[in-house]
Structure formats: structure tokens, C-alpha cells
Amino acid sequence: MSVAFRRESDEEHKEPRFELPIPPGPNLVTARGLTLIESRVAALEALEAATDDEKRDLRYWRQRLATAQLAPPPPEDEVGFGSHVRFTLNGQVREVRIVGEDEADPTAGLLALLSPLAQALIGAGEGDFVAFGGKEDAIEVKSVSL
């Protein structure tokens, strides 16, 4: 039969799906981040007829759970992993919490530890000025809390 008249399944035209990349470095998590990973694994394990994508996601989240390291709280007077930071950048006041890769959501103010902004803030204290984006004193840290 001619190929023109043969119905091909949608499966034949799908692009191959690769494993989700594991971010480099230690998998530091906050208590909230660990809870999010655990709930993601539980939700995926509860699926009886999982698709290939869901199975791939489950492998990823199981790996992230197995390597999760609950980070100790940072010092109260300096920015560290898990800190809530209020600062000014370009004349605008912003607030962020520094979290692990899997918990990060910049639109919700949750910055990944390895992001350039978080890296600039690490170690700063209230009242400090920090270089960012090639500018000295681009950021003024207003407050640091847990």
C-alpha cells in the first residue's frame, strides 16, 4: 500500500525526549524545598498508567530527593542560603528568598542559589552595598532575615 494512504501513528513523529538534566553541585534544599520534592515524588508514584514523560519526571525527582541536603539556617545578620533579603536595585525595592534550584521561581521572589543575583548577595549584611552587573554599589541591602 502506498505511504500516502497509510495512517501513521502520532508516536512515529514525536521528537525523542531526553532525561532531565541534574543541576551541577550539591543539591541544597530548604525545609520547604524538601517538602515540595517529596510531594512531587509521591504524586508521580501515585500515577498508575504513567506516560513516558511522567516516568522520566519520576526518575528525576527520585534522584533529586536522594541527593537532597537540608541546609542549616544561615547566620541571621548576613545573606545566605534560605535568607529573606530586602534590597534596592536600580532604585527599586525588591524582596527575595535564596533557595535551591528545584524550589526557585523568580516571579515569586524565590531565587536559585546559583543565580547571579543570589551570588552577588551572599555574605552581605544589612546596610552593605554590593557590586552587580558590572556596577559597584549597584545593590543596597536593606534587611536580612530568616
Listing of model-derived features with the role each one plays in the protein:
Residues 1-65:
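Helix-rich terminal scaffold detector
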Residues 62-75:
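Amphipathic alpha-helical coiled-coil segments
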Residues 72-142:
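Non-DNA-binding regulatory cores of transcription-related proteins
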